[in-house]
Amino acid sequence: MFTRILILAIGVVGAGQAVEIATGAMLGKGYEARSFYLRDGAGPWKRTYTGSQFRPEAAGRLMNVRVAQAVVHDEWLTEEAFDPEKNTERVIAALDDYKKHGILSISVSLQGANAAYERTKHIKRTRPYKLGPGKGMSMSAFEPDGSLKPRWMERTLRLARELDKRGMVLNLVYFYAYQDEVLRDPEAIDRATVTATDWLIANNVRNCVIEIANEYNGGDFDYGRYIERAMGHLIQLAKGRFVEKGAAFRLPVSASSNGEVKAGEEVMKVADGIRDYGDLVLTHGNHLSPEVKRKRVKELMGNAGIPGPIVINEDDIGRETTLEHLKLELGSCDAIWESGGSWGYMPWVQFQIWPFVDYRPGTSSVVKDEMPEPERNRAYFKAVLEHIAKKIYK
Protein backbone atom coordinates (compact mmCIF):
# COMPACT_ATOMS: atom_id res chain seq x y z
CA MET A 1 0.00 0.00 0.00
CA PHE A 2 2.72 2.49 0.94
CA THR A 3 4.62 1.57 -2.25
CA ARG A 4 1.72 2.48 -4.49
CA ILE A 5 1.25 5.87 -2.82
CA LEU A 6 4.98 6.57 -3.04
CA ILE A 7 5.03 5.83 -6.78
CA LEU A 8 2.12 8.20 -7.24
CA ALA A 9 4.06 10.90 -5.42
CA ILE A 10 7.32 10.43 -7.34
CA GLY A 11 5.49 10.94 -10.61
CA VAL A 12 4.30 14.43 -9.74
CA VAL A 13 6.76 16.11 -7.38
CA GLY A 14 8.17 19.21 -9.01
CA ALA A 15 5.80 18.97 -11.99
CA GLY A 16 4.71 22.49 -12.92
CA GLN A 17 4.36 25.54 -10.72
CA ALA A 18 1.99 24.92 -7.85
CA VAL A 19 -0.27 27.55 -6.35
CA GLU A 20 0.72 28.00 -2.71
CA ILE A 21 -1.32 29.36 0.20
CA ALA A 22 -0.22 30.92 3.48
CA THR A 23 -1.56 33.29 6.08
CA GLY A 24 0.01 36.67 6.71
CA ALA A 25 0.91 35.58 10.23
CA MET A 26 2.90 32.68 8.74
CA LEU A 27 4.76 35.00 6.36
CA GLY A 28 5.71 37.48 9.07
CA LYS A 29 6.63 41.14 9.06
CA GLY A 30 5.14 43.19 6.25
CA TYR A 31 2.12 40.91 5.79
CA GLU A 32 -1.35 41.29 7.27
CA ALA A 33 -1.77 38.60 9.91
CA ARG A 34 -5.51 38.07 9.35
CA SER A 35 -5.23 37.79 5.55
CA PHE A 36 -4.70 34.85 3.22
CA TYR A 37 -1.97 35.03 0.60
CA LEU A 38 -1.36 33.08 -2.61
CA ARG A 39 1.59 32.82 -4.95
CA ASP A 40 2.29 31.02 -8.21
CA GLY A 41 5.47 28.99 -8.04
CA ALA A 42 8.29 31.20 -6.79
CA GLY A 43 6.36 34.39 -7.55
CA PRO A 44 5.54 37.10 -5.02
CA TRP A 45 2.97 36.57 -2.30
CA LYS A 46 -0.25 38.47 -2.98
CA ARG A 47 -3.36 38.77 -0.89
CA THR A 48 -6.25 36.75 -2.26
CA TYR A 49 -8.63 38.61 -4.58
CA THR A 50 -5.94 41.12 -5.56
CA GLY A 51 -6.50 42.74 -8.95
CA SER A 52 -8.53 45.34 -10.79
CA GLN A 53 -11.59 43.08 -11.12
CA PHE A 54 -11.97 42.64 -7.35
CA ARG A 55 -13.47 44.89 -4.71
CA PRO A 56 -10.76 46.20 -2.35
CA GLU A 57 -12.57 44.83 0.71
CA ALA A 58 -12.32 41.29 -0.72
CA ALA A 59 -8.52 41.22 -0.44
CA GLY A 60 -7.22 38.62 1.98
CA ARG A 61 -10.45 36.62 2.27
CA LEU A 62 -11.06 32.97 1.41
CA MET A 63 -14.66 32.31 0.37
CA ASN A 64 -15.55 28.66 0.54
CA VAL A 65 -18.08 25.99 -0.40
CA ARG A 66 -18.26 22.79 1.65
CA VAL A 67 -18.02 19.78 -0.67
CA ALA A 68 -17.25 17.25 2.06
CA GLN A 69 -18.29 14.19 0.03
CA ALA A 70 -16.08 14.99 -3.00
CA VAL A 71 -13.80 11.94 -2.71
CA VAL A 72 -15.98 9.74 -0.51
CA HIS A 73 -16.67 6.02 -0.75
CA ASP A 74 -18.91 4.26 1.77
CA GLU A 75 -17.52 0.75 1.55
CA TRP A 76 -20.62 -0.66 3.25
CA LEU A 77 -23.07 0.90 0.80
CA THR A 78 -24.89 -2.00 -0.87
CA GLU A 79 -28.44 -0.63 -0.98
CA GLU A 80 -27.87 1.61 -4.03
CA ALA A 81 -25.23 1.96 -6.74
CA PHE A 82 -22.53 4.61 -6.29
CA ASP A 83 -19.43 5.31 -8.38
CA PRO A 84 -16.88 7.29 -6.33
CA GLU A 85 -14.82 8.16 -9.41
CA LYS A 86 -17.78 9.70 -11.21
CA ASN A 87 -18.72 11.51 -8.02
CA THR A 88 -15.32 13.22 -7.95
CA GLU A 89 -15.61 14.04 -11.65
CA ARG A 90 -18.95 15.78 -10.99
CA VAL A 91 -17.23 17.96 -8.41
CA ILE A 92 -14.42 18.82 -10.83
CA ALA A 93 -17.01 19.73 -13.47
CA ALA A 94 -18.50 22.28 -11.05
CA LEU A 95 -15.25 24.07 -10.13
CA ASP A 96 -15.42 26.66 -12.90
CA ASP A 97 -18.92 27.64 -11.75
CA TYR A 98 -17.63 28.10 -8.22
CA LYS A 99 -14.58 30.10 -9.31
CA LYS A 100 -16.51 32.54 -11.48
CA HIS A 101 -18.70 33.36 -8.48
CA GLY A 102 -15.70 34.20 -6.31
CA ILE A 103 -15.24 30.87 -4.52
CA LEU A 104 -11.53 30.23 -3.90
CA SER A 105 -11.72 27.17 -1.65
CA ILE A 106 -13.69 23.96 -1.22
CA SER A 107 -13.78 21.85 1.95
CA VAL A 108 -13.27 18.11 1.37
CA SER A 109 -13.12 15.35 3.98
CA LEU A 110 -10.96 12.23 4.11
CA GLN A 111 -13.66 10.66 6.29
CA GLY A 112 -16.75 11.94 4.51
CA ALA A 113 -19.55 13.67 6.40
CA ASN A 114 -23.14 13.10 7.48
CA ALA A 115 -24.84 11.52 4.47
CA ALA A 116 -28.25 11.59 6.21
CA TYR A 117 -29.14 8.16 4.87
CA GLU A 118 -32.12 8.11 7.23
CA ARG A 119 -33.87 10.60 4.92
CA THR A 120 -33.97 8.03 2.11
CA LYS A 121 -36.39 5.17 1.50
CA HIS A 122 -33.86 2.43 0.92
CA ILE A 123 -30.90 3.13 3.21
CA LYS A 124 -31.55 2.84 6.93
CA ARG A 125 -28.10 3.27 8.45
CA THR A 126 -26.51 5.93 10.64
CA ARG A 127 -23.04 7.44 10.90
CA PRO A 128 -21.02 5.47 13.48
CA TYR A 129 -18.48 3.05 12.03
CA LYS A 130 -18.58 1.01 15.23
CA LEU A 131 -22.14 -0.16 14.42
CA GLY A 132 -20.74 -2.33 11.63
CA PRO A 133 -22.05 -3.26 8.15
CA GLY A 134 -25.78 -2.86 7.71
CA LYS A 135 -26.06 -0.36 10.57
CA GLY A 136 -23.16 2.09 10.28
CA MET A 137 -21.00 3.73 7.62
CA SER A 138 -17.44 3.00 6.50
CA MET A 139 -16.23 6.26 4.96
CA SER A 140 -12.51 6.66 5.53
CA ALA A 141 -9.35 7.26 3.53
CA PHE A 142 -7.47 5.68 6.45
CA GLU A 143 -6.87 2.04 7.24
CA PRO A 144 -7.14 1.00 10.91
CA ASP A 145 -3.36 1.43 11.34
CA GLY A 146 -3.40 5.00 9.98
CA SER A 147 -2.07 4.21 6.52
CA LEU A 148 -3.80 5.63 3.44
CA LYS A 149 -6.11 3.95 0.93
CA PRO A 150 -4.67 4.51 -2.56
CA ARG A 151 -7.97 4.96 -4.42
CA TRP A 152 -9.15 7.65 -2.01
CA MET A 153 -5.86 9.51 -2.37
CA GLU A 154 -5.85 9.21 -6.15
CA ARG A 155 -9.20 11.00 -6.19
CA THR A 156 -7.94 13.57 -3.70
CA LEU A 157 -4.85 14.27 -5.79
CA ARG A 158 -6.87 14.60 -8.98
CA LEU A 159 -9.12 17.12 -7.29
CA ALA A 160 -6.18 19.04 -5.77
CA ARG A 161 -4.56 19.31 -9.20
CA GLU A 162 -7.77 20.56 -10.80
CA LEU A 163 -8.12 23.18 -8.07
CA ASP A 164 -4.50 24.19 -8.60
CA LYS A 165 -5.11 24.75 -12.33
CA ARG A 166 -7.80 27.27 -11.40
CA GLY A 167 -5.81 29.00 -8.66
CA MET A 168 -8.10 27.50 -6.03
CA VAL A 169 -7.46 25.96 -2.61
CA LEU A 170 -8.30 22.60 -1.03
CA ASN A 171 -9.49 22.77 2.59
CA LEU A 172 -8.69 19.17 3.53
CA VAL A 173 -10.33 17.64 6.61
CA TYR A 174 -8.50 14.65 8.07
CA PHE A 175 -10.92 13.37 10.73
CA TYR A 176 -14.70 13.30 11.07
CA ALA A 177 -16.64 12.21 14.17
CA TYR A 178 -18.02 8.66 14.09
CA GLN A 179 -15.40 7.68 11.49
CA ASP A 180 -12.35 8.29 13.68
CA GLU A 181 -13.25 4.93 15.19
CA VAL A 182 -12.00 3.32 11.95
CA LEU A 183 -8.57 4.00 13.44
CA ARG A 184 -7.80 1.36 16.01
CA ASP A 185 -6.28 3.53 18.76
CA PRO A 186 -4.88 7.02 19.47
CA GLU A 187 -1.49 5.96 18.12
CA ALA A 188 -3.15 5.19 14.79
CA ILE A 189 -4.73 8.66 14.81
CA ASP A 190 -1.26 10.15 15.26
CA ARG A 191 0.03 7.95 12.46
CA ALA A 192 -2.83 9.00 10.18
CA THR A 193 -1.96 12.66 10.82
CA VAL A 194 1.62 11.94 9.81
CA THR A 195 0.80 9.88 6.73
CA ALA A 196 -1.76 12.36 5.39
CA THR A 197 0.61 15.29 5.88
CA ASP A 198 3.54 13.39 4.38
CA TRP A 199 1.33 12.58 1.40
CA LEU A 200 0.64 16.30 0.84
CA ILE A 201 4.36 17.05 1.04
CA ALA A 202 5.37 14.18 -1.26
CA ASN A 203 2.82 15.24 -3.86
CA ASN A 204 3.76 18.94 -3.64
CA VAL A 205 0.19 19.92 -2.76
CA ARG A 206 0.77 23.54 -1.81
CA ASN A 207 -2.77 24.81 -2.42
CA CYS A 208 -4.16 23.31 0.78
CA VAL A 209 -5.37 24.32 4.23
CA ILE A 210 -5.14 21.37 6.63
CA GLU A 211 -8.16 20.97 8.91
CA ILE A 212 -7.14 18.30 11.39
CA ALA A 213 -10.73 17.58 12.45
CA ASN A 214 -14.26 18.68 11.69
CA GLU A 215 -15.95 20.09 14.81
CA TYR A 216 -13.24 18.80 17.11
CA ASN A 217 -15.23 20.00 20.15
CA GLY A 218 -18.54 18.33 19.33
CA GLY A 219 -18.08 15.53 21.88
CA ASP A 220 -18.50 12.72 19.34
CA PHE A 221 -14.90 11.64 18.80
CA ASP A 222 -13.85 8.29 20.23
CA TYR A 223 -11.03 7.09 22.51
CA GLY A 224 -12.01 9.41 25.34
CA ARG A 225 -12.38 12.32 22.90
CA TYR A 226 -8.71 11.93 22.03
CA ILE A 227 -8.79 14.21 19.00
CA GLU A 228 -10.32 17.02 21.03
CA ARG A 229 -7.95 16.57 23.97
CA ALA A 230 -4.86 16.18 21.78
CA MET A 231 -5.61 18.94 19.28
CA GLY A 232 -2.51 20.98 20.10
CA HIS A 233 -0.37 17.86 19.76
CA LEU A 234 -1.96 16.91 16.42
CA ILE A 235 -1.48 20.40 14.97
CA GLN A 236 2.17 20.37 16.05
CA LEU A 237 2.56 16.88 14.63
CA ALA A 238 1.30 18.01 11.21
CA LYS A 239 3.35 21.21 11.21
CA GLY A 240 6.45 19.31 12.28
CA ARG A 241 6.34 17.05 9.23
CA PHE A 242 7.29 19.96 6.96
CA VAL A 243 10.47 20.44 9.01
CA GLU A 244 11.14 16.71 9.32
CA LYS A 245 10.80 16.21 5.56
CA GLY A 246 12.77 19.32 4.65
CA ALA A 247 9.80 20.58 2.63
CA ALA A 248 10.18 23.76 0.59
CA PHE A 249 6.77 24.92 1.81
CA ARG A 250 4.51 24.76 4.85
CA LEU A 251 0.72 24.60 4.83
CA PRO A 252 -1.67 26.40 7.21
CA VAL A 253 -3.00 24.03 9.89
CA SER A 254 -6.01 24.27 12.21
CA ALA A 255 -9.24 22.44 13.12
CA SER A 256 -12.87 23.55 13.03
CA SER A 257 -15.11 24.03 16.06
CA ASN A 258 -18.89 23.75 16.11
CA GLY A 259 -19.15 27.43 17.05
CA GLU A 260 -21.03 26.89 20.29
CA VAL A 261 -20.81 29.18 23.29
CA LYS A 262 -21.13 27.14 26.46
CA ALA A 263 -23.36 28.08 29.37
CA GLY A 264 -21.75 30.73 31.53
CA GLU A 265 -19.42 31.92 28.76
CA GLU A 266 -19.97 35.20 26.94
CA VAL A 267 -17.76 34.54 23.92
CA MET A 268 -16.86 31.53 21.82
CA LYS A 269 -13.81 29.86 23.29
CA VAL A 270 -10.94 28.89 21.00
CA ALA A 271 -9.18 25.77 22.26
CA ASP A 272 -5.74 26.27 23.73
CA GLY A 273 -4.23 23.95 21.11
CA ILE A 274 -5.56 26.08 18.27
CA ARG A 275 -4.81 29.40 19.95
CA ASP A 276 -1.24 28.34 20.73
CA TYR A 277 -0.34 26.33 17.63
CA GLY A 278 -2.94 26.91 14.88
CA ASP A 279 -2.45 29.22 11.91
CA LEU A 280 -6.08 30.32 11.64
CA VAL A 281 -9.48 29.87 13.26
CA LEU A 282 -12.07 27.68 11.53
CA THR A 283 -15.54 27.55 13.01
CA HIS A 284 -19.09 26.64 12.00
CA GLY A 285 -22.24 28.73 12.14
CA ASN A 286 -25.02 26.25 11.42
CA HIS A 287 -28.46 27.26 12.73
CA LEU A 288 -27.16 30.42 14.42
CA SER A 289 -28.72 33.77 13.56
CA PRO A 290 -26.76 36.23 11.39
CA GLU A 291 -26.42 38.62 14.32
CA VAL A 292 -24.96 35.96 16.60
CA LYS A 293 -22.40 35.13 13.91
CA ARG A 294 -21.62 38.80 13.39
CA LYS A 295 -20.91 39.20 17.12
CA ARG A 296 -18.74 36.10 17.35
CA VAL A 297 -16.59 36.87 14.32
CA LYS A 298 -16.15 40.47 15.47
CA GLU A 299 -15.04 39.22 18.91
CA LEU A 300 -12.55 36.81 17.36
CA MET A 301 -11.17 39.43 14.98
CA GLY A 302 -10.64 41.81 17.90
CA ASN A 303 -8.81 39.28 20.06
CA ALA A 304 -5.05 39.69 19.58
CA GLY A 305 -4.47 36.22 21.04
CA ILE A 306 -6.40 34.49 18.26
CA PRO A 307 -4.20 33.28 15.38
CA GLY A 308 -4.53 34.35 11.75
CA PRO A 309 -7.68 34.74 9.64
CA ILE A 310 -11.18 33.83 10.85
CA VAL A 311 -13.22 31.55 8.59
CA ILE A 312 -16.71 30.19 9.11
CA ASN A 313 -16.19 27.32 6.69
CA GLU A 314 -19.49 25.52 7.27
CA ASP A 315 -22.75 27.41 7.46
CA ASP A 316 -26.36 26.75 6.61
CA ILE A 317 -29.67 27.90 8.00
CA GLY A 318 -32.09 25.14 8.91
CA ARG A 319 -31.22 22.83 6.01
CA GLU A 320 -34.15 24.09 3.95
CA THR A 321 -34.25 26.09 0.71
CA THR A 322 -37.22 28.40 1.23
CA LEU A 323 -37.24 32.15 0.62
CA GLU A 324 -37.26 32.72 4.37
CA HIS A 325 -34.15 30.59 4.78
CA LEU A 326 -32.45 32.31 1.84
CA LYS A 327 -32.87 35.69 3.50
CA LEU A 328 -31.13 34.37 6.61
CA GLU A 329 -28.45 32.62 4.54
CA LEU A 330 -27.49 35.80 2.72
CA GLY A 331 -27.72 37.71 5.99
CA SER A 332 -25.18 35.32 7.49
CA CYS A 333 -22.79 35.95 4.61
CA ASP A 334 -23.22 39.71 5.08
CA ALA A 335 -22.70 39.55 8.84
CA ILE A 336 -19.47 37.57 8.62
CA TRP A 337 -18.17 39.69 5.74
CA GLU A 338 -18.87 42.95 7.56
CA SER A 339 -17.10 41.60 10.66
CA GLY A 340 -13.94 40.89 8.67
CA GLY A 341 -14.20 37.11 8.30
CA SER A 342 -14.48 34.69 5.39
CA TRP A 343 -17.60 32.61 4.80
CA GLY A 344 -18.24 29.07 3.62
CA TYR A 345 -21.68 27.85 2.56
CA MET A 346 -22.71 24.25 3.18
CA PRO A 347 -25.10 23.09 0.43
CA TRP A 348 -26.66 20.50 2.72
CA VAL A 349 -29.66 19.45 0.65
CA GLN A 350 -27.89 19.91 -2.68
CA PHE A 351 -24.97 17.56 -2.20
CA GLN A 352 -23.83 16.86 1.34
CA ILE A 353 -26.63 14.36 1.85
CA TRP A 354 -27.19 11.27 -0.26
CA PRO A 355 -27.07 10.93 -3.27
CA PHE A 356 -24.51 13.80 -3.61
CA VAL A 357 -25.64 14.99 -7.03
CA ASP A 358 -26.40 18.71 -7.42
CA TYR A 359 -22.83 20.00 -7.32
CA ARG A 360 -23.62 22.59 -9.97
CA PRO A 361 -25.98 25.50 -9.29
CA GLY A 362 -29.11 26.12 -11.32
CA THR A 363 -29.23 28.46 -14.30
CA SER A 364 -31.62 30.79 -12.48
CA SER A 365 -31.30 32.35 -9.03
CA VAL A 366 -35.02 33.00 -8.69
CA VAL A 367 -36.25 31.04 -5.66
CA LYS A 368 -39.97 30.40 -5.19
CA ASP A 369 -41.34 28.27 -2.39
CA GLU A 370 -43.80 26.60 -4.75
CA MET A 371 -41.04 25.29 -7.04
CA PRO A 372 -40.39 21.53 -7.21
CA GLU A 373 -37.77 20.87 -4.56
CA PRO A 374 -34.89 19.79 -6.87
CA GLU A 375 -35.30 22.93 -9.00
CA ARG A 376 -35.61 25.14 -5.92
CA ASN A 377 -32.49 23.62 -4.37
CA ARG A 378 -30.41 24.45 -7.44
CA ALA A 379 -31.83 27.98 -7.68
CA TYR A 380 -31.08 28.53 -3.99
CA PHE A 381 -27.45 27.51 -4.50
CA LYS A 382 -27.23 29.85 -7.50
CA ALA A 383 -28.66 32.73 -5.44
CA VAL A 384 -26.06 32.16 -2.70
CA LEU A 385 -23.22 32.06 -5.23
CA GLU A 386 -24.43 35.23 -6.95
CA HIS A 387 -24.54 36.99 -3.59
CA ILE A 388 -20.92 36.01 -2.94
CA ALA A 389 -19.90 37.17 -6.42
CA LYS A 390 -21.33 40.63 -5.75
CA LYS A 391 -19.08 40.95 -2.71
CA ILE A 392 -15.97 39.80 -4.56
CA TYR A 393 -16.20 41.41 -7.99
CA LYS A 394 -16.63 45.06 -8.98
Where are these regions (language model features)?
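Active-site mouth of glycoside hydrolases
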Residues: 32, 41, 52-278
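N-terminal signal peptide c-region/cleavage motif recognized by signal peptidases
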Residues: 13-15
